[in-house]
Amino acid sequence: MEHQLLCCEVETIRRAYPDTNLLNDRVLRAMLKTEETCAPSVSYFKCVQREIVPSMRKIVATWMLEVCEEQKCEEEVFPLAMNYLDRFLSLEPLKKSRLQLLGATCMFVASKMKETIPLTAEKLCIYTDNSIRPEELLQMELLLVNKLKWNLAAMTPHDFIEHFLSKMPEADENKQIIRKHAQTFVALCATDVKFISNPPSMVAAGSVVAAMQGLNLGSPNNFLSCYRTTHFLSRVIKCDPDCLRACQEQIEALLESSLRQAQQNIDPKATEEEGEVEEEAGLACTPTDVRDVDI
């Protein structure tokens, strides 16, 4: 009797059906033209910030990613929040004691832009171990949006991934795997300051190629083999193939170092032994197998 009134409904997010009109070349051209308008400065650590250094950005970015993952935020929230953070730091000097406040505020605003049910100020304050108050976060929100001149609809690599996949004659199940791994690479790139200089379209294209190469989805005789895919996507985003290939190699190197760091945190002794073997064997010329990554 007590189970008769038990509610077994599961809340699902209602999503619109894919619209092919939003994936045509005209939209992509407009996105490529717009992406530069919301790009942060690549030299703000030297020219603007006095206390904040790249290692601090890495720490707060990792924390922001963990919060977004634990709250199961949309994939676009974290890269968009990092775009806000970098653009703000490109304009305004900030004390290092307020960097976590800025990170929480960027997630707060980004979730309003991309989430059906955005993160609350109170919940974000809990993730800071109550080191900030909701009132401080709301005040910082006003400062953030004013400094960004309310230009909050910035392009992120996620906006380009679907365009690239729609142009590839891959099977739907393969596209789903590529999409998932490419999204993981995009989040990983957002934590690393080296990728600030790359436009979102290049990060997205590099992530797609890196995902395909790691998953071995491109055969040598296939149009979508990694070499041809790189040239194809470089034409799509109108960039030099060598620049795109360099971005892809950066992504693969970042993935490899992240996996090594994660393994070191689990078993430091085993990592030291593996490091000695790697030094003798030299660096591998093939990228890390992305199937080893826990998505």
UniProtKB/Swiss-Prot annotation:
There is a cross-link at residue 269 (Glycyl lysine isopeptide (Lys-Gly) (interchain with G-Cter in ubiquitin)). Gene3D superfamilies: Cyclin-like. Residues 28-152 form the Cyclin N-terminal domain. CDD domains: CYCLIN_CCND1_rpt1, CYCLIN_CCND1_rpt2. The keyword Ubl conjugation applies. Regulatory component of the cyclin D1-CDK4 (DC) complex that phosphorylates and inhibits members of the retinoblastoma (RB) protein family including RB1 and regulates the cell-cycle during G(1)/S transition. Phosphorylation of RB1 allows dissociation of the transcription factor E2F from the RB/E2F complex and the subsequent transcription of E2F target genes which are responsible for the progression through the G(1) phase. Hypophosphorylates RB1 in early G(1) phase. Cyclin D-CDK4 complexes are major integrators of various mitogenenic and antimitogenic signals. This is G1/S-specific cyclin-D1. It comes from Rattus norvegicus (Rat). The lineage of its organism: Eukaryota, Metazoa, Chordata, Craniata, Vertebrata. The gene is Ccnd1.
